[in-house]
């Protein structure tokens, strides 16, 4: 779902107002206060660490350590290798280091716009709703042409999947991530800009002593000395992404004036393999069968030590931190127009952002009931295999704004379906294919565990889009409108 993180606005963090019999009379004043708090004025800045989930590739397949990057709300990319302060309305940036960025020069780091990092597009309204490598590669090529002129001229950079600049484009298509954010100052940002713009950008990546987590740790400690550190015991002397996220979070909790917020970006449903939870070193030894079994056989005497080390000092659950300090990635204008704004204002906003288990269960039951009642429709029948069929038979393309399309051959002709938030219900998008796509997407979201799905506020918008798609598909088929076209009231519960 969209993120509009203006450099002049904080992420929205909820707190539960006191309930009272006069809440109806206080609602207008409360909404004015809420919207004023969300207004695009801000005098300070933010920095955050991004904990990226683990991919089943390379050394990550063994270590399960994932990846780490750093987020700035007031620092933007002048080029992928140069900082500047953001202009009003810009959404900040993400900076990261890799083993091999793969560009003409061996750079240590690149910096990209936040929404490009998350979705592969500048405006999140054009974010993809369907994850496939065809779409991701099309977004990568668009990014290369628009941003890497003069930096990516070699055949290896342009065509090799080993060039890791690609991981900084539409990352949510390949992995989920958590963003831990605190307040900083513009003065701190200016100092960092001067430091990095004047320092050599030379790659010295080393997995043991100078990896992505070391890189983020040093940047965070520039803002807040000793805020992030390695876990020598649980990561065997190295720095892991999870250790940096854990120590940074604990530091922020000891300093409430930093206003800790946590955001969760779920991996986009589709045909790309699901990413995995990030793990510390001892945690991976205990949870990975391919490591635990050999250890139990050949080094069984060390197993109790490893278990005790992890249980006592190494545990950290990003999802629980999100539930404690949730921030929404919905922009103020989306909140203001949301039919759920009143309930967000008057109920526990943490529950409203994360979603109560009872509310999710009610949506699952409603979805299953409606699918059963419409089981004869082709869209309902195809939903379990739709992603695979769309990926296998479709040809991906992206427009100048990054909005993605899939074109399929049909009866000697072709038909197109929009696979971005901005075009899935467009006039040019086939209504029945669009409905099938949103059915498959909704089904995947509702089947996902809580650490694999988006927020409840975002899902409310998903449900509204599904209703519109249902009505459009029913009109195209010309039968009676689908029962999914009505809004199903869901009562929230405070139980997770």
Task: Please place each PLM-identified region on the residue numbering.
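Activation targets extended, charge/polar-rich intrinsically disordered C-terminal tails
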Residues: 140-184, 189-496
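Short, surface-exposed beta-edge/turn micro-motifs
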Residues: 46, 66-67
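Short His-Asn-centered micro-motif
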Residues: 51-52, 72, 207-210
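N-terminal post-signal-peptidase region of extra-cytosolic proteins
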Residues: 49-58
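N-terminal secretory signal peptides that target proteins for export/translocation
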Residues: 1-23
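Sec/Tat signal peptide C-region and signal peptidase I cleavage site
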Residues: 39-45
């Amino acid at each position: 779902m969209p993120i509009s993180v203006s450099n002049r606005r904080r992420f929205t963090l909820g707190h539960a107002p006191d309930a009272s019999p006069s809440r109806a009379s206080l609602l207008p004043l409360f909404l004015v206060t809420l919207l004023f708090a969300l207004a695009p004025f801000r005098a300070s800045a933010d920095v955050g660490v991004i904990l990226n989930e683990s991919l089943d590739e390379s050394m990550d397949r063994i270590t399960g350590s994932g990846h780490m990057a750093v987020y700035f709300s007031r620092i933007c990319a002048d080029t992928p290798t140069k900082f500047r302060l953001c202009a009003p309305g810009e959404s900040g940036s993400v900076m990261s280091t890799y083993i091999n960025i793969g560009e003409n020069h061996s750079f240590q780091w690149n910096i990209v716009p936040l929404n490009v990092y998350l979705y592969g597009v500048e405006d999140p309204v054009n974010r993809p709703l369907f994850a496939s490598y065809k779409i991701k590669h099309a977004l990568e090529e668009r990014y290369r042409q628009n941003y890497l002129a003069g930096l990516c001229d070699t055949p290896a950079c342009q065509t090799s999947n080993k060039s890791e600049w690609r991981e900084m484009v539409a990352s949510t298509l390949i992995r989920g991530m958590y963003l831990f954010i605190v307040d900083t100052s513009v003065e701190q940002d200016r100092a960092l800009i001067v430091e990095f713009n004047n320092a050599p950008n030379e790659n010295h990546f080393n997995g043991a002593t100078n990896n992505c987590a070391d890189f983020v740790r040093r940047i965070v400690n520039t803002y807040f000395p000793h805020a992030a550190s390695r876990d020598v015991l649980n990561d065997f002397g190295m720095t892991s992404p999870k250790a940096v996220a854990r120590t940074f979070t604990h530091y922020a909790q000891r300093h409430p004036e930093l206003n800790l917020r946590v955001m969760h970006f779920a991996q986009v449903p589709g045909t790309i393999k699901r990413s995995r939870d990030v793990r510390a070193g001892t945690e991976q030894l205990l949870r990975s069968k391919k490591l635990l079994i050999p250890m139990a056989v050949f080094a069984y005497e060390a197993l109790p030590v490893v278990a005790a080390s992890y249980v006592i000092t190494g545990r950290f659950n990003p999802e629980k931190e999100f539930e404690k300090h949730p921030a929404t990635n919905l922009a103020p204008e989306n909140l203001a127009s949301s039919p759920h704004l009143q309930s967000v204002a008057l109920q526990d906003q943490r529950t409203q952002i994360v979603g109560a288990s009872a509310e999710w269960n009610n949506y699952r039951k409603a979805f299953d009931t409606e699918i059963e009642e419409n089981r004869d429709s082709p869209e309902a029948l195809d939903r379990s295999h739709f992603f695979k069929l769309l990926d296998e038979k479709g040809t991906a393309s992206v427009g100048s704004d990054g909005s993605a399309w899939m074109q399929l051959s049909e009866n000697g002709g072709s038909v197109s379906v929009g696979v971005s938030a901005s075009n899935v219900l467009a006039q040019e998008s086939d209504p029945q294919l669009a409905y099938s796509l949103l059915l498959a997407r909704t089904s995947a979201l509702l089947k996902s565990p809580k650490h694999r799905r988006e927020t409840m506020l975002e899902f409310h918008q998903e449900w509204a889009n599904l209703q519109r798609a249902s009505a459009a598909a029913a009109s195209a088929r010309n039968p009676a409108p689908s029962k999914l076209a009505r809004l199903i009231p869901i009562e929230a519960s405070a139980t997770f």
